């Protein structure tokens, strides 16, 4: 039995790594400008290649696919941590209004800076998104203390998201034309326009958060078995819950700051990983969710770029098309069980 479980886990990770390799290669080749395998290989090795071709690979496609990988993993891991915290299978940064709160404060920061002719830095956007995520999370926590049914908590989270979105739209109404264009493109959700500085920043933020999540794997497992059990195992519940909130908020804030609000990844991918690995062990699920989220977003970004080329679809629309049916199936299957 243990051998079968081990083989399943290794098989699951091998499948994810294979899919990751396939989508990385596919994303490098996909685009309006066709490049041969030999050209791409020379560019990656730093050999002599055309300036235009080199710029396309090194300045556009590589930063974009790495951003999709990192931010997709961050969003999926954030959803897993929130589902653990609330003991709710459909908890996620988008559903609970956390992404919308981050979107609102990033909008405020962008408007304030752009109206003064200043550029927006990664640090400012992440800080603004984190503040918005924490404000929304505080409202959700306040409601969770008064509402016993998790279905009502989700509805309240959706309402918080609508309020934040309405306030964001209100702010955009009074913005100047140039700011509206920037905000509109960002608010639709996209991995385009990423720079290597953006990639480095998100890699550091998400990498540290991923490491901290690994350090919490034992307390998470104890918490999954019940709060009483966790207390008996010596888990400081208040500090542990605070850590989960902070980690999930940092992850969702980082995603929103760079790529805008992206839906359903944080809900759908953790359930896909649980079904694939047949395990709820945090030591397995934390890397699986991060890797699975990256693969899922690479696939969705590929569809967004190529399905209606040269027109690009917002990444959030594509993740909703593929993620929503997974959530619906999961809820029906859970109800039947």
Which role does the model predict for each range below?
Residues 1-337:
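Alpha-helical transmembrane segments in inner-membrane proteins
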